[in-house]
Design a protein with these regions (language model features):
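Hydrophobic C-terminal alpha-helix "anchor/cap" residues
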Residues: 28, 162-163
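A generic structural signal for alpha->beta connector loops
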Residues: 52, 75-77, 125, 165-168
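Short aromatic-enriched loop/helix-cap "lid" or pocket-rim segments at secondary-structure transitions
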Residues: 94, 139-144, 181-182
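Short catalytic micro-motifs in class I SAM-dependent methyltransferases
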Residues: 101-105
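Short, glycine-/aromatic-enriched active-site segment of Class I SAM-dependent methyltransferases
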Residues: 130-150
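Conserved S-adenosyl-L-methionine
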Residues: 166-179
Length: 182
């Protein structure tokens, strides 16, 4: 659904999307039980699925989850569930959670709920990866993207937010499909 529109509007953006999923897959390789929050149509989720034992994808929109289930292949089976992370934790603990391109759509007033509900769904020694465009990137974003991005941050703001919840915070940047530490 979403990815088809991306292919129509800006095909090179698919490279950026898939690069993010490849990064997550490498970071979470070997994890037992992984959750994606805000999966949309789950187009890139299969890349992560190759590297982890069990994957669950969740989105608040049942249209996406119904579409994912209708396209599910036997050899690529994973759980797809309707869940709004702003309404509560998922209900069980995961080794790792990732959420790509979600935070920027959540109001600043709700960002603590978003993070706290993911934390409540994360095992004590679990890993959380959050991917979000920087405020600086908005100068290059499409008008449609900018319209929905209500909570973009710079590196310092994102790090400060994450340090409220985590002892260890590592920030990465991305230009086109290249991930780096700058």
């Amino acid at each position: 659904l979403m990815t088809d529109q991306v292919w129509h509007d800006d095909p090179k953006r698919l490279l950026f999307l898939l690069s993010r999923y490849k990064f997550v897959a490498k970071m979470l390789s070997g994890k037992e039980d992984v959750l994606e929050i805000g999966c949309g149509d789950a187009f890139g989720s299969r890349i992560v699925h190759q590297e982890v034992k069990k994957l669950t994808v969740a989105d608040f929109d049942p249209i996406f989850i119904d579409d994912i289930r209708s396209r599910m292949e036997k050899d690529w089976h994973y759980e797809a569930k309707v869940h709004d992370i702003l309404c509560g934790p998922v209900g069980r603990k995961f080794d790792a959670i990732y959420s790509l391109d979600v935070l920027e759509h959540i109001s600043k007033d709700s960002e603590a709920i978003y993070i706290e509900n993911m934390l409540a769904s994360l095992s004590d020694h679990g890993v959380l990866i959050i991917g979000t465009p920087s405020i600086q990137s908005q100068a290059y974003a499409t008008p449609q993207s900018v319209e929905g991005h209500v909570n973009c941050k710079d590196h310092a703001e994102l790090k400060e937010l994450m340090q409220r919840y985590f002892h260890n915070v590592f920030l990465f940047s991305m230009n086109d499909e290249v991930v780096h530490t700058g």
